[in-house]
Amino acid sequence: FLPCYLNRQIITLLSTLGVEDQVFETIQEERITLLNGLLNERFSAVEAIQASYAGECHKVVVEMLVAGYARNREPFLSSMLQAFKAAQVYQICKRSRIFIPNGRVLMGCLDETADLAYGEVFIQISASDGSLSVIQGNVVVAKNPCLHPGDVRVLVAVDSPNLQHMVDCIVFPQNGNWWCVFHI
């Protein structure tokens, strides 16, 4: 899976649509706090790296942390954590790239079973441990690239037994108006 980041365009559109700037600032502050604990707290380091799915080379770092290697005594581990933190802080400060912990970048597909109603979507995501979970409730869906306020929608994620085989994608309905498929 790919983690979700808000970029300048999406932040601008969400702000235009009424999302308070304080929301973005709070998310940024929480991320900076987590990154500051990266070098001092093992749990923060593992959580930050796993959540952002930093790539294959960082799996080794997570395995070393879980195995109990000391961050301040292992030069490779320390340098990898510092590089990860520097890259993440750079993304936040210079590119306004805000990590969304519960967000995902998903490919959209059509509900061939015709189970979903207009305004509903089906989302089932996988975790790093291989477990699956179905998302339910209101979700914010944005097209990429996101250039127009209509590219951001709030839809309702529902469970559908006939779509359980669909993983790490967002399933749009074939019923009703096609705006939520063609405009997203």
Predicted regions and their residues:
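Core mixed alpha/beta domains of very large multi-subunit molecular machines
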Residues: F1-I184
